[in-house]
A protein has these predicted regions:
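Acidic, low-complexity intrinsically disordered segments
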Residues: 2-201
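Conserved SAM/AdoMet-binding glycine-rich loop
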Residues: 4-6, 207-354
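Flexible glycine/acidic-rich beta-alpha junction loops that bind and position SAM and/or redox cofactors
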Residues: 13, 77, 108-111, 182, ...
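Hydrophobic residues within beta-strands of alpha/beta enzymes
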Residues: 67, 101, 120, 217-220, ...
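Aromatic/hydrophobic pocket-lining residues that form the small-molecule binding cavity
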Residues: 87-90, 202, 244, 278, ...
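Catalytic cores of alpha/beta
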Residues: 111-116, 276-282, 351-370
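Conserved, mostly hydrophobic/aromatic
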Residues: 178, 202, 297, 379, ...
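Terminal RNA-binding accessory module
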Residues: 400-490
Length: 490
């Protein structure tokens, strides 16, 4: 049984799988294939970018018994060295390979006519693959955590087939699905059933990835890391700092010489409701992680009307308190040149109840944060994507383009660039920059990290090598720098 996995890339509210990230999807699928009896050497993995660049891969697909395509973007993104698969490309694959292809991932939420096919998995693609190989069944179902326990370990070795291995970031899942009773109007995470993995299972997966050569990890596949293994009490659910400490300690023991351990996704409401537990968790993260970490918070809007109409759960005063707590614990500078742990804020436009006043509300929130001397490592301003399965999908909100782009540029100029000058002042040595592309007389590079800064290094330098550089200037989300001699400890 020869199988080919095509990684068309995924980007979801609580999962990133666009290179240099590799999401859990292709790893679980490879594990399901091996668990079903396939030999590891017969499981092939290619990214969509590889396929475009190397026509020979089509011949391998032609000879395969099963082709599995992972794809889907449910949040908008811009990528430096990757182009996600297009609907047209998926349609071409379906037409060419017909009964021997399966397609899945968040692309299942698309309502494009070309995807109205029995080969598109409406639930978990990895479960559909396993059942097809073991039971000859084509019934859609959700996978079980006991299956992921096996598949995550058995499929870990597939990362060695990635074209950028070992310089890839492994996205790690702790749980998925939103545990809230009322969900944000736009989010696709509630469309997954809520399921939580055991700590030992996550650690075992990290160990398997590490033994396969992985050195870069992000605990990012969950909507709120601070709520992982939360405890039920008489007054509701509260975070469990002991569980987070066990998770991080276990990962460090399983991967003793890892180079990056970062996180993603923090619900600021957790901090507001449980500040003591949240502070303890943040301290644990700083103890075990690597510097340059970002706790991205889904604020989405500070307009009271928008907050109410879209089931958001946090108001401006609460946002500021959450930002203060993360700054208090994590703003000290780390050994790689960047602060240990800083918050990020996501702002979303095109929500119900939005007006011109919304833009002013959001700008005022960011100005207040800046005036307090607090730092935000990232401000992510984006337009909402609509899916029929979500409440927002039933409405249409007009976004005035000129207003949106003017607002975004204002935030860059007034907030982001001044903060970036504090986060990485001139003269700061940024370490472990991987050079990725050329742009005029500059070489573009980034650290392998969660939300890495783009660094424009003077000179045309060799690509795909690590280097250190000294900061010489600042712009929105990027630094200019000059190369410096790497330290002996790097």
């Amino acid at each position: 049984m020869r199988s080919v996995i095509i990684d068309g890339y995924v980007d979801e509210p609580a999962c990133l799988g666009v290179q240099p990230y590799i999401s859990p999807y292709p790893r679980y699928i490879a594990g399901a294939m091996i668990d079903a009896g396939a030999k590891p050497r017969d499981v092939h993995y290619y990214t969509i970018d590889q396929l475009r660049a190397e026509p020979r891969i089509i011949g391998i697909m032609d000879r395969a018994d099963l082709i599995v395509v992972v794809a889907g973007l449910t949040v908008p993104g811009r990528y430096l060295n990757a182009k996600p698969i297009t609907i047209r490309e998926v349609g071409d694959f379906i037409a060419r390979y017909n009964e021997k292809i399966l397609v899945g991932g968040p692309i299942r939420l698309s309502h494009e006519s070309v995807l109205r096919s029995e080969c598109v998995a409406e639930k978990d693609l990895e479960a559909r693959v396993f059942d097809r190989l073991t039971e000859k069944s084509e019934t859609d179902r959700w996978r079980r955590t006991s299956e992921i326990k096996r598949w995550s370990v058995k499929g870990a070795q597939i990362i060695q087939r990635h074209p950028h291995f070992p310089h890839i970031m492994c996205e790690i899942e702790t749980y998925r699905g939103c545990p809230r009773e009322r969900h944000c109007s736009f989010c696709t995470e509630p469309l997954y059933p809520h399921s939580s993995r055991e700590i030992d299972d996550v650690v075992d997966e990290v160990r398997a990835l590490y033994e396969s050569g992985a050195r870069y990890f992000r605990i990012g596949r969950q909507p709120d890391l601070f709520s992982y293994k939360r405890i039920e009490t008489n007054s509701g659910f509260k975070p469990d700092p002991t569980a987070i400490e066990k998770l991080y300690r276990g990962i460090r023991r399983a991967a003793p010489e890892l180079k990056v351990l970062h996180m993603d996704n923090l619900n600021p409401a957790t901090i507001i409701e449980y500040p003591d537990e949240s502070r303890e968790i943040a301290k644990t993260i700083v103890k075990y992680h690597t510097p340059g970490d970002v706790a991205a918070m889904g604020v989405e809007s500070s307009d009271p009307r928008v907050i109410h109409e879209n089931n958001l759960q946090i108001y401006p005063e609460d946002v500021i308190k959450a930002v203060e707590l993360i700054n208090e614990v994590g703003s000290m500078r780390g050994e790689n040149g960047l602060p240990e742990l800083l918050p990020g804020i996501n702002l979303l436009y095109g929500l119900k109840g939005e007006s011109k006043r919304t833009y002013q509300h959001n700008l005022e929130l960011l100005q207040r944060i800046h005036e307090k001397g607090l730092l935000l490592r990232r401000i992510n301003i984006r337009k909402a994507m609509r899916f029929k399965e979500t409440p927002l999908g039933e409405t249409k909100v007009h976004i005035e383009k000129r207003l949106f782009y003017h607002h975004r540029e204002t935030i860059k100029r007034r907030i982001e660039v001044p903060m970036l000058k504090e986060i990485a002042p001139e003269g700061t040595i940024i370490k472990e920059i991987l050079t990725e592309a050329h742009d005029g007389r500059f070489t573009l590079g980034r650290q392998i990290a969660s939300y890495p800064l783009l660094i424009r290094i003077e000179g045309i330098l060799k690509l795909r090598v690590f280097m250190d550089a000294a900061v010489t200037g600042h712009s929105h989300r990027s630094l200019t720098a000059i190369p410096v001699e790497r330290s002996a400890s790097t």
